[in-house]
């Protein structure tokens, strides 16, 4: 709902003065090219956004020792994984990037993903050097810092990237409706041109 309000407000600003125009179906906006990255997956292979070209990519930022919102977000993604059926892994790919690279090694991320029912053929849990993670997080609008308790406060932003590598929509927080995200992903699948 928050995302829809942002999108509709932006669209209204773009098409002001067209009150007499025929209604059109709502298309997802194009924010711009998705920032490139190459990071290390749970199986220790390097994964780049370019490797995923041709698929809809849903990108989240998490850390494995988080005890509240990260598990909720990961559970939502696991539910979407199931609902996508045959499109998952074939046409849709999930990426979860840690904001705690010092603790979240590939092995730790693999255990976290497995505990949440991730199907690794379509879901990569990525880590990297602290500098790599800072760079990727910054370019996606993610801010994070370690607290005195050892937790990490960070922005919750889920980014949806189309098969051409364009950033199409971002969801703030974790209270978004999974069905809304699913519909946006399916909309992008319908927009994808066969190669």
What kind of region is each of these model predictions?
Residues 1-11:
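N-terminal export leaders
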Residues 9-19:
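Hydrophobic h-region of N-terminal signal peptides that target proteins for export
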Residues 21-50, 75:
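N-terminal "domain-start" segment that seeds a small globular fold
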Residues 49-77:
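Short active-site neighborhood of thiol/selenol oxidoreductases, capturing the structured segment around
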Residues 58-59, 94, 158:
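Hydrophobic beta-strand anchors of alpha/beta hydrolase catalytic cores
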Residues 72-136:
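Structural microenvironment flanking redox-active thiols in thiol-disulfide oxidoreductases
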Residues 121-123, 134, 138-147, 153-158:
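Structural micro-motif
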Residues 147-195:
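Thiol-/selenol-based redox modules, centered on thioredoxin-like
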């Amino acid at each position: 709902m928050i995302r829809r309000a942002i999108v509709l407000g932006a669209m209204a600003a773009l098409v002001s003065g067209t009150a007499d125009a025929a209604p059109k179906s709502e298309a997802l906006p194009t924010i711009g090219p998705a920032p490139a990255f190459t990071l290390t997956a749970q199986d220790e292979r390097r994964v780049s956004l370019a490797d995923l070209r041709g698929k809809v990519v849903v990108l989240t930022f998490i850390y494995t020792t988080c005890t509240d919102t990260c598990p909720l977000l990961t559970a939502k993604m696991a539910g979407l994984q199931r609902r996508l059926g045959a499109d998952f892994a074939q046409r849709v790919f999930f990426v979860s990037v840690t904001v705690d690279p010092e603790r979240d090694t590939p092995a730790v991320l693999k255990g976290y993903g497995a505990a949440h029912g991730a199907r690794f053929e379509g879901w990569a849990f990525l880590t990297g050097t602290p500098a790599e993670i800072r760079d990727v997080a910054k370019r996606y609008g993610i801010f994070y810092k370690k607290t005195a308790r050892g937790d990490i406060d960070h922005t919750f932003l889920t980014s949806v990237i189309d098969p051409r590598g364009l950033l199409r929509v971002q969801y703030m927080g974790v209270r978004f409706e999974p069905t809304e995200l699913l519909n946006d992903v399916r909309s992008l699948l319908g927009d994808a041109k066969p190669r």
